[in-house]
Amino acid sequence: MPVLMSPEIANKFKEKWLMLHPEDQDNVSGSVHFDDSLTSLHWLQNFSILSANPERTPSSGCHPQHLFYYKNQLGGTDSPSSPPAGDTAATGMPQTPGNPTTSCSSLANPYALQQAGHYITGQTNPAEEIDYKTNRHVKPPYSYATLICMAMQASNKTKITLSAIYSWITENFCYYRYAEPSWQNSIRHNLSLNKCFMKVPRQKDEPGKGGFWQIDPQYADMFVNGVFKRRRMPATNFNTQRQSKMLSSPSSSYTSQCNQQMGMGHFQGNKRKQVFPKRGNKLARISKSPLLTSDIKTSDVLRGDFDLASVFDDVLSGNDSTFEDLDINTALSSLGCEMEPSSQIHNQSGYSNEDEQACAYLEANGIIGCNMEDFHHQQHHQQAQVHPQYYEGMFSDQQNQQHPWEIKEEAQPVPLSLDHGYAFCEGFFSEMQLWERGESYM
């Protein structure tokens, strides 16, 4: 088998190609111009939106005679080459990189276009005012609420019927005259649902059927110069609503009241006759919610922790004199809080009021920063003079009460036997607790 060189292979391939495609006999020299206008996008790089004519409609194009005129005027600059004969796919597409032929304004400068303005027939005139009263093909650019307001103002009456609104719209807008009657349902829905319109019942002495409609006076300013404007909620309105919700809650009202009274106490100095909300009122206010009733005892237990935190804040902020007062304040505040349930047991009104005042003063002292040593001596002196029997009985009850963890079990003697037999082991294991036995781990 002979070995063929590349030129011979090319000649054989050319002969076979011409045998299969006899229409290519005229282009033997290889001067065939392949049209790549369908895939070329070089014109898109040079295209500019600023050079395009915005007033010209997309469907309007340039006549071939106009293109020929521009070619003669400008000397063929940026003008596309004519497509080959019979090539319908390349019509209107550029053969060389450049601007597309569909835009007439991109083919010449403004001066040349001004000279050749009388040859251009594809451009439309500027938008003229549309007469909606006679044009049945263009829908008016007004909302249904605006149409209702326009009908009410055109009637020069305080109230108007629904049929009068229909008749005014069909009389002034030809589009609704020939359109489907579904727009009447939209008019009725706007009258019923829009808060700017209100229905006025018909009086007994007025003839006819149905009620009247009018614009709500508080929303009359929304219809200005034929345009129905919607009100926007100001940014401050949200803040005021949020503040009102926060102030309406019981906890926030209680804290605001305490802050106000603490500020008054700070200016009054060390006066002990300070009025504070009672603890019973606070517990009653919290117990109104059924979900929080189980948390009342827990809050009483954790009250000492919160008092300790407030004392630390006061010491660090400089309200108390030294850190030595910290232990005194903590002890007195915890003592005052524990005195409250004991006063409820005795059911003595005079004693409970005195105890609550002492607790309130102790809490105020932890926040305001009064001298605790002076108060401790005065309070002890008053207790000795006013109610000595009451306080003695109260503290005697506290001394008699013992906590569960303070109760100690008496050690019971275990009978031991000198016999190291089975009896000794049995007696030893019988006295062991349940968690000490080996059976509990099995």
From Swiss-Prot:
A biological process from GO: motile cilium assembly
Gene Ontology MF: a single term: DNA-binding transcription factor activity, RNA polymerase II-specific
Localization annotation: Nucleus
DNA-binding region, residues: 139-233
Biased composition (Polar residues): 93-106
InterPro entries given in the database record: FH_FOXJ1, Fork_head_dom, FOXJ1, TF_fork_head_CS_1, TF_fork_head_CS_2, WH-like_DNA-bd_sf, WH_DNA-bd_sf
Matching CDD domains: FH_FOXJ1
PANTHER family: FORKHEAD BOX PROTEIN J1, FORKHEAD BOX PROTEIN J1-B
Protein name: Forkhead box protein J1-B
Highest classification ranks of the organism: Eukaryota, Metazoa, Chordata, Craniata, Vertebrata
